[in-house]
Regions:
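Bacterial N-terminal signal peptides that target proteins for export
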Residues: 1-7
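Bacterial N-terminal signal peptides
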Residues: 7-18
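Short, well-ordered secondary-structure micro-motifs within conserved domains or adaptor modules
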Residues: 51-76
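Catalytic-core regions of glycoside hydrolase
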Residues: 172, 192-196, 206, 211, ...
Length: 725
């Protein structure tokens, strides 16, 4: 036999490996859903590293003992103690046991042998770390960018993967949002025609939600159902509503509220029935604003008490509560903040917390820097404007403030700036802060509609592309002292030692959207889309940010200086303090960081790994966008100086900077065109002068914006001094 020596060698090597494989017994001292999940995760990691699992403790090399919870450790805390051949993992509760087990799993996956495993302890910094997940059915906004996730989000395999990601990153709550969730979950006993599905279809929906809540419970993840208000199903309106004029069949947001008794009764009974039929659902949420026009803040609170709060009471069990702080102090759905509304809301929250069927603390939620928290860690505003101190003084005892960190700024490009997250957490370390929501309203992290067809990649779902985003936020909310080495090690585990520089590269390059959003003031979702360098234009359409708009737009961060204010001050022989980030300073920061990021990834060989190719490419895209912005800022300063002073060299300098900005934009296009599809984008759904159907066909890609980038050069070439106009 020609290959007999080779076969014998293979058998000898195989026997040697097997004989050296160490055996492990995993012991659950107090079996539960959570300990079973922890044991399964440990088992998977161990077998992947060629450890042999045993069902009995006799003659094994190692015993991993999952100890019963020890409340003295505190909620969600854990201890890993290694004594010789026994590793004991103890949690302050079931959640802590899972976290301790996952910390060991992480070591195993990173190649740490059980012999080298170190004892450790960890406890949570913030008790509430939630994902805001907008479901793709009966969505708040309407776009192909949301509808395309429908099938993915009806697949329990997707939810298993998403919940695994959540618990691995220490997120402990999943909040599910849509306009009117009830009729996807129940057939209301007294309003059966409100549900649009037949029995088989409804059973499929119910099976989905029960699976989500069951899997979340296994992972010690709380679940919240957060409907918008006041909405009913179209089928309810047609069958039962006695006032057809108030029928909101298309679920418009900014209309008068239907405060009829039948709608109150229907909503209340739906809440009760959902809580009774889904015992693993942890809590509910209140949102005050949409379809509540014509109502005062007090009337909105009263409606909530008569429906959702009373529905919770009638369910006959304890329920947790998220009370989203209202953003309108007027009878309009889009109002402004006020001290009076804050006082009214605080009183309502504290009265809810006193109810025996509500499990405290109540999470009182606010949007951090409106819809674009990926800007500055400094709190400048909330939805509706200024935040007063009513919710904080005196210090609340029955509720905690949670901050919603919205991401409406980057969906395609990967992101990761650990020091930004740490700074955010450090800025919100007050005793009244309970935690964070993290999520979007214009994006659902389900189907990957970005990646062009090609050779295989390591991800199936969109959120898996953004693993660093979730890992940074989740782990640093749990423990902000988690070192960068943890995140760098994940790059190395995935792609090998050459990827060890990627965390630093991302930290530098993906600071670009943070700096743009700090320098370019915004309000709601569509007002800024950082990865596209897009925002509201003068007509309130979403378009590429022109050099004129970059010049005149106020800044968000009070330490930043706009182009207009900078030129006005400098031409008047004024100056700025060292703490101020002027356009030239910002341009230099962008140039320095983005050039260094490009240098860090220049030598990484991606030819044999398409997934690594995308990771490196996104660093390059962010870096080139940052360099584009740096040139554009310098061009804007020169152009505005020319307009103010009439100095011709300033005009020529502006043209040269804007031409350089175009070259960097062309680099972005060259990188992204073969990698990314033309993408649907919710931000384009309400462009004025077009029908919804026309807007829904619009697609985003950097290549599509090139003509607008060229227009900046033409604008500079045709510019005239202000005095000559």
């Amino acid at each position: 036999m020609k290959n007999k020596p080779l076969l014998l060698l293979f058998l000898v090597v195989g026997l040697t490996v097997d004989s050296l494989a160490q055996s492990v017994f995993i012991q659950q001292t107090q079996p539960s859903r959570q300990s079973a999940y922890a044991a399964q995760q440990l088992a998977s990691a161990l077998t992947a590293k060629r450890y042999v699992l045993r069902s009995k403790s006799q003659s094994v090399d190692y015993t991993i003992r999952l100890e019963q919870p020890n409340s003295q450790l505190g909620p969600e805390a854990y201890a890993v103690d290694k004594q010789n051949k026994q590793i004991t993992i103890t949690g302050g509760d079931g959640r802590g046991l899972i976290y301790g087990s996952l910390s060991v799993v992480e070591d195993i996956q990173n190649g740490v042998a059980l012999a080298q495993l170190k004892s450790r302890r960890e406890q949570p910094h913030l008790p509430f770390r939630a994902i805001k997940f907008d479901l793709p059915w009966d969505t708040y906004r309407h776009s192909d960018a949301l509808d395309l996730h429908y099938d993915t989000c009806r697949d329990t395999l997707y939810w298993k993967a998403f919940l695994d990601m959540m618990v691995a990153n220490r997120f402990n709550a999943l909040s599910l949002w849509n306009l009117h969730p009830y009729t996807f979950m129940i057939r209301p006993t007294n309003f059966p025609a409100a549900t649009p599905f037949n029995d088989q279809q409804l059973a499929e929906w119910q099976s989905l939600f029960r699976a989500i809540f069951r899997m979340a419970n296994e992972r010690a993840i709380d679940t919240y159902l957060i409907p918008f208000n006041i909405f009913t199903s179209p089928e309810f309106s047609k069958a039962y509503n006695v006032n057809p004029k108030l029928n909101n069949l298309d679920h418009h947001h900014f209309i008068d509220g239907d405060t009829s008794e039948i709608v109150k009764r229907y909503t209340r009974e739906c809440v009760t029935q959902v809580l009774q039929e889904y015992p693993e659902l942890t809590g509910f949420g209140l949102t005050l604003g949409e379809a509540m026009g014509g109502m005062t803040p007090q009337q909105r609170e009263n409606w909530m008490k008569a429906t959702i709060i009373d529905g919770m009471r009638l369910a006959g069990r304890k329920t947790k509560l998220v009370h989203r702080i209202p953003f309108s102090s007027t009878t309009g759905s889009l109002g402004v903040t006020s001290i009076d509304t804050e006082k009214l809301t605080r009183k309502s929250i504290e009265s809810e917390a006193a109810l025996p069927f509500i499990e405290g603390p109540i999470w009182a939620d606010l949007k951090y820097n409106w819809s674009h928290a990926h800007s500055t860690p400094t709190l400048v505003k909330v939805h509706g404007g200024k935040l007063f101190d009513t919710y904080f003084k005196p210090d609340p005892t029955t509720y905690k403030i949670t901050w919603t960190v919205r991401n409406e700024d980057f969906f395609c490009l990967r992101w990761g700036v650990p020091d930004f997250v740490r700074a955010h957490v450090a800025a919100n370390n007050q005793s009244y802060v309970g935690g964070y929501f993290l999520g979007s309203e214009t994006y659902i992290p389900a189907k990957d509609y970005f990646t062009t067809p090609g050779s295989p990649v390591d991800w199936r779902y969109a959120f898996e592309r953004q693993w660093l985003f979730y890992k940074l936020w989740g782990r640093l909310l749990y423990n902000p002292t988690t070192p960068d080495a943890v995140f760098s090690a994940e790059f190395v585990r995935r792609y090998g030692s050459s990827a060890s520089r990627l965390l630093e590269a991302y930290s530098l390059a993906s600071s670009t959207p943070l700096r743009l959003a700090s320098a370019f003031d915004f309000t709601w979702d569509f007002s800024l889309y950082s990865e596209g360098m897009m925002g509201f234009d003068a007509n309130k359409n979403v378009s590429y940010i022109s050099v004129n708009q970059l010049t005149t737009q106020p800044t968000l961060d009070p330490n930043y200086v706009s182009v207009n204010d900078y030129v006005k001050t400098i031409t008047a022989s004024g100056s700025f303090g060292k703490e101020k980030i002027t356009p030239p300073v910002l341009a230099k920061m962008l140039e320095t960081d983005c050039q260094k990021a490009l240098q860090l990834v220049r030598s990484i060989n991606t030819s044999a790994n398409r997934s690594l190719l995308y990771e490196v490419a996104d660093v390059k895209v962010w870096a080139n966008l940052g360099l584009h912005l740096a040139e554009k800022l310098q061009g804007a300063v020169a152009l505005q100086t020319y307009r103010t002073t009439g100095q011709e060299p300033q005009k020529q300098e502006a043209i040269q900077h804007l031409k350089a900005a175009l070259r960097y934009w062309d680099d972005v296009v060259a990188i992204t065109r073969p990698l990314y599809n033309d993408m649907p984008l919710v931000h384009l759904a309400e462009q004025k002068g077009h029908t919804w159907e026309e807007n829904n066909k619009l697609r985003f890609h950097w290549a599509k914006l090139r003509p607008a980038v060229v227009k900046d050069i033409e604008l500079a070439e045709n510019a005239q001094p202000i005095s000559a106009k």
